[in-house]
Amino acid sequence: MDLSLLFWIYLINSVILINHEIDSAYWQEWKLVNPNDTSDVKGFLIIHFPMLFAILFGLILIDRGLIAGYVISLIVAAGGIFAFFFHFYHLRKGRKEFNNWLSKLILILTFPISIFQIALTIMDLI
């Protein structure tokens, strides 16, 4: 089995981002956008079914060398970069969510791995 470097970086980034999403449920991430939101986790979980399916399906498509996999790879990596900036913006504003060493480590790891994933995706496409 000859798996590309992109496959492994995508897999690593996906595991990190999925762990971030687990952490997001703990911190009730939806309240970062709307602090007055009194809803519970149900809506948050529902939107994660298609999101996690797309992330995992994208890995299969990358393994098969399909263009859709490369598109999903770029979207997943962009999501990692967005998560990094979104959460550190809120941390700098004094929010308590994600303010522990493991939550921060997960976010910090997403940034360089996502940049590397974008670079590998583009290099594989050209």
Model-derived segments and spans:
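N-terminal signal-anchor/start-transfer transmembrane helix
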Residues: I9-W27
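Juxtamembrane boundary at the C-terminal end of a transmembrane helix
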Residues: F116-I126
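Membrane-helix boundary connector in multi-pass membrane proteins
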Residues: D63-L66, Y70, F84-S103, L125
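Core segments of transmembrane alpha-helices
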Residues: F44-I60, L109-I115
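Membrane-helix exit/interface motif
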Residues: E29-W30, F53-I62, F86-H90
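Cytosolic, membrane-interface loops and tails of multi-pass inner-membrane proteins
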Residues: I22-D40
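Interfacial segments of alpha-helical transmembrane regions
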Residues: D2-N13, A68-V76
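Hydrophobic alpha-helical membrane segments
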Residues: H48, Y70-Y89, L107-S114
